[in-house]
Amino acid sequence: MTVYTDPAEIVRAVCAGVSLLVSGNLDQAQREAQLDWLAALYAERTDVRHPLATSGLPLRTRADVRRHFAQAPTRADGIERFEPVGLHVHRTGDPEVVITEFRYEGSAGGRPVSIQNIFVTRVRDGVIIESRDYADHIGAARAFGHLPALAAALAAEEHTQ
């Protein structure tokens, strides 16, 4: 595995790794290796949150992150192409923190896909220790035909509050 030290390189590696996982037509062994590789970019104890997601539950360990990534191919059924584009990394006054703007573009079921993302990521000792991943979950649900499931999850969440 390539050892990354620069926070921008690590976030770019995550984006490219997710792209390969989602659209790379990997066999089971390749998929497992890709999941391990992606998870290894995160610290054993981490704090990854998706504030705009319906569940909003934090990912606290490398194993949580791996399980999260393992769900990606099922969330993206029918994807023909899925790649990060327009990736721009903003350096901050804190050398551990970068803000990354990009979109995943591709196609699913013959329809174009464009999902906007902003990641605020803290990297220490070459691994991600904290990240806030703001993704367009409504756009993703629309692109992958999951709007009814998203609406049901939101309705269920409303009834539990």
What are these regions (language model features)?
Residues 1-40, 44, 150-161:
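Short, low-complexity N-terminal intrinsically disordered segments enriched in polar/charged residues
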Residues 16-30, 56-59, 74-78, 98-101:
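Short, mixed-charge, low-aromatic patches
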